[in-house]
Structure formats: structure tokens, C-alpha cells
Amino acid sequence: MLIRKLISRAITASVIIGVVLIAACSPNNATPTPIYQRISDAKLKAGDTLPAPTGDIILTVTGKIGTKNGADNIVMDRDMIESVGQVEYKVTDPFETKDYVYRGPLMSDLLDLWKVGSDATTLQVVALDDYVVKVPIADIRKYPVLFALQQDGQYMPVSTRGPAMLVFPYNNFEFNQTVYNDYWAWQIKAIDIS
């Protein structure tokens, strides 16, 4: 009887040790791959006074913003946008079905810089060809959406969707592409926040 109890305890202990070892070695406990890589830290941060742009203005921001550097708006050149800090990630472009590495600031960092209040719900993004799309701010806050200025290490000219475009991390999250493909606005010239 004593031998059976000892054998039973030894088997139970072996099973527990085996389960612990398997769980410890499983990929679920591995360090997750980061969604994006930080390329540069912010030099222009939320709460800072916005300087006047020194280069060509590529973005005008209006609406529910808590700061301005223009008459009733924010105007930004490429250097200002990049000074918010840049990240990059690889994503399969839904329009070209090809992987690209996009780089630019996170839209959430831009919203913070612009002092967008909690009562704002929508970004109305306007492109150079007057394409307009309304993007929920909740999605901008939930996902690491890029205000991309570069594609595969090159600034995007207007002829290839520049100077800027919104990029969603399709490779890392499940998106309803019927809805979200419309949010991939490019040739962005203005954003109105409501």
C-alpha cells in the first residue's frame, strides 16, 4: 500500500513538472515581437509650443485642437512632423498586395501634440485630389496607426502617394478591410478634427 502511494505521488509530481516545463517552453511565453520599431525619439512633444514651419507646409490641421501655430490652425512641414518622433513597421499594402516598411510618427502622438480633447471623435482626412475620409479617433488611439512619410526608406513623392499617408498595422491586427481600406488615405494635405 505504501509503495502504491509513493508511486502515485511520483507519477503526479512527474506530470506536474512536465506540464510546467512544457508551459515554460511554449511560444506563448516568448517575448512578443514588437509591432513597430522606434527610429527617433520625440523632440517636439505634447505640451510644447508649436514653432512656425520653416519648410514647405505639407499638412494643415483644423477643428477641435487645443494649440495653434497659425491663425486658427496648425501648419506643419516635414521636419516638424518628423520631430514628433518616428517609428516604422512592415505591413502588406492592401492596394499593391506587397510588403513595405513605412516610417513616420504615430498618429496618436500627433493627436497628443495637437491637444485633441476627449470630446473629439473623428478625423476628416483630405487628400490633394480632394478625396475625403472620416476616420474614428478611437481607432487612431487603439492601434499604432502611422502618419507615414517614407516607404522602404524613401520619402514618398506625390506621384507615389506622398507626401504622407495613413497606414494601419494590417499584419498585426484583424481589420475589416472593407471598412479600413478606405482609411488608408494618401497624398494627405489636411486634417479636420471634430
Protein language model features and the residues they cover:
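Bacterial N-terminal signal peptides that target proteins for export
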Residues: 2-14
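C-terminal motif of bacterial Sec signal peptides marking the signal peptidase cleavage site
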Residues: 21-24
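N-terminal intrinsically disordered, low-complexity segments enriched in P/E/S/T
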Residues: 26-194
